[in-house]
Amino acid sequence: MEKVTNDTIKHVAALAQLEFSEEELAKFTPQMGKILEMAEELQAVDTTGVEETVQVVDRDTVFREDVPEKWQTREEMMKNVPDKSNGFVKVPVIIDKDDNQ
């Protein structure tokens, strides 16, 4: 396994659009290294003959029927929106488009 470095954490943080201080990087880098070491140990476990688990919760544990309810009017909702334009909710850009793509 590759050693986890500050650059590794910075790269993953950038992908998740997170920013960390140098103190946080110094703290998170060894923690992430330990987590990945544990995951590597799990990969070594022999699971031959073990049935795959796709859901750990019983599917019959529904507490109520999923019935849509009228929550509030559009106007009431728009009163709570911090940034709007022409009656639409404005949200920050999360995907940068490159002209070369």
UniProtKB/Swiss-Prot annotation:
Cited InterPro entries: Asp/Glu-ADT_sf_sub_c, GatC
Keyword terms, alphabetized: ATP-binding, Ligase, Nucleotide-binding, Protein biosynthesis
Pfam families attached to this UniProt entry: GatC
Protein origin, superkingdom: Bacteria
EC id: 6.3.5.-
Annotated catalysed reactions: L-glutamyl-tRNA(Gln) + L-glutamine + ATP + H2O = L-glutaminyl-tRNA(Gln) + L-glutamate + ADP + phosphate + H(+); L-aspartyl-tRNA(Asn) + L-glutamine + ATP + H2O = L-asparaginyl-tRNA(Asn) + L-glutamate + ADP + phosphate + 2 H(+)
BP-aspect Gene Ontology terms: glutaminyl-tRNAGln biosynthesis via transamidation; regulation of translational fidelity; translation
GO molecular function annotation: asparaginyl-tRNA synthase (glutamine-hydrolyzing) activity; ATP binding; glutaminyl-tRNA synthase (glutamine-hydrolyzing) activity
Subunit and partners: Heterotrimer of A, B and C subunits.
Function statement: Allows the formation of correctly charged Asn-tRNA(Asn) or Gln-tRNA(Gln) through the transamidation of misacylated Asp-tRNA(Asn) or Glu-tRNA(Gln) in organisms which lack either or both of asparaginyl-tRNA or glutaminyl-tRNA synthetases. The reaction takes place in the presence of glutamine and ATP through an activated phospho-Asp-tRNA(Asn) or phospho-Glu-tRNA(Gln).
Family stated for the protein in its record: Belongs to the GatC family.
Protein's recorded name: Aspartyl/glutamyl-tRNA(Asn/Gln) amidotransferase subunit C
Organism this protein belongs to: Lactobacillus delbrueckii subsp. bulgaricus (strain ATCC 11842 / DSM 20081 / BCRC 10696 / JCM 1002 / NBRC 13953 / NCIMB 11778 / NCTC 12712 / WDCM 00102 / Lb 14)
Lineage: Bacteria, Bacillati, Bacillota, Bacilli, Lactobacillales
